[in-house]
Amino acid sequence: MTDRQPLISKNDDIINNLTRFYTELTEFEKIIKDVGTGRDTTTLRSTLHKKKVNLADDLKVIAQQIKQLPSSKLPKFQQEKIVKQFKEASSKFEELLSTSNKKESSHEPIVPSQQQQQQQNNGNSNNNGYNTRGGYNQQQQQQQQQYNDYTNNNNNNNNNEVEQYNRLEQALKSGIEQDEEEYTNRILDERNANARQIARDVAMLKEAMDDIAVMVGEQGEMLEKVDDNVTNADVAVEDAVVELEKAYVYKSSYRKKMIIFVICLLVTLVAVGIFLAIYYGVIKKK
């Protein structure tokens, strides 16, 4: 946690500085629009000069922070976005600087009446005939020359920094392209692995379908055999019913015969008994 917090703070500082720089650029652009108008006073020119210096200093601070981006743990696409925003801000600042220099050289600032009167009085009391307007112009030219030298040095430094940022951006892009290539290759490998897995699954499914087809064929044969057995059993049942009917008829006939036989036997026994009784009865009487 202690190592992570400073990193987040630095990254937030870069974003905050860029945001503030864009805001100051907007204010700088508004001031430039007032150059050559009725609001173009010496105070405005002084504010404009301070704004230039502050923006140049802020640009250097942001440049130093961006140089430390590769060592941060920010994703590369975020680093690239920050570098891109910085380049756009630098280009916008250089464009506004060029516009400001052209407008300042084309227009003279308006001197307030009280300050102009005081400068005229000082000029009249001066023995060498110093002209207030000319002295101010000379002073303004000296300040402009000093600022131009400062701006040229800053532009040279900015150009060197822009080259470094271009190299940094190219390195980031190459790293991102490499990451994208690795990511694409990883996706392709995963897709190929999935395709191979699908092919294996399809092969296994085909084998399972073949096994099911064989089982269905075997079951079909078994069903045919079962159907034959059922048919045979049905025939056997019908035959058994016929046999049972025959057996029932035979049993009924046999029962009738047995009854007749028993009746005949009883009649015979009764007749024999009567005969014996008569026979023995007659013999005993004699």
From Swiss-Prot:
The chain crosses the membrane at residues 258-278. Residues 185-247 form the t-SNARE coiled-coil homology domain. It is a single-pass membrane protein. Keywords: Coiled coil, Membrane, Transmembrane, Transmembrane helix. The keyword Nucleus does not apply. GO terms for biological process: endoplasmic reticulum to Golgi vesicle-mediated transport; hypotonic response; intracellular protein transport; vesicle docking; vesicle fusion; vesicle-mediated transport. InterPro entries: SNARE (IPR010989), Syntaxin (IPR045242), Syntaxin_N (IPR006011), T_SNARE_dom (IPR000727). SMART domains: t_SNARE (SM00397). Residues 1-257 are cytoplasmic. Belongs to the syntaxin family. Gene3D superfamilies: 1.20.5.110, 1.20.58.70. It is found in: Membrane. One of its GO terms (molecular function) is SNARE binding. Residues 97-107 have a biased composition (Basic and acidic residues). This is Probable syntaxin-7B. Residues 279-286 are vesicular. Residues 97-160 are annotated as: Disordered. SUPFAM superfamilies: t-snare proteins (SSF47661). Residues 114-160 have a biased composition (Low complexity). One of its GO terms (cellular component) is endosome. Its main location: membrane. Pfam families: SNARE, Syntaxin_2. The keyword Protease does not apply.
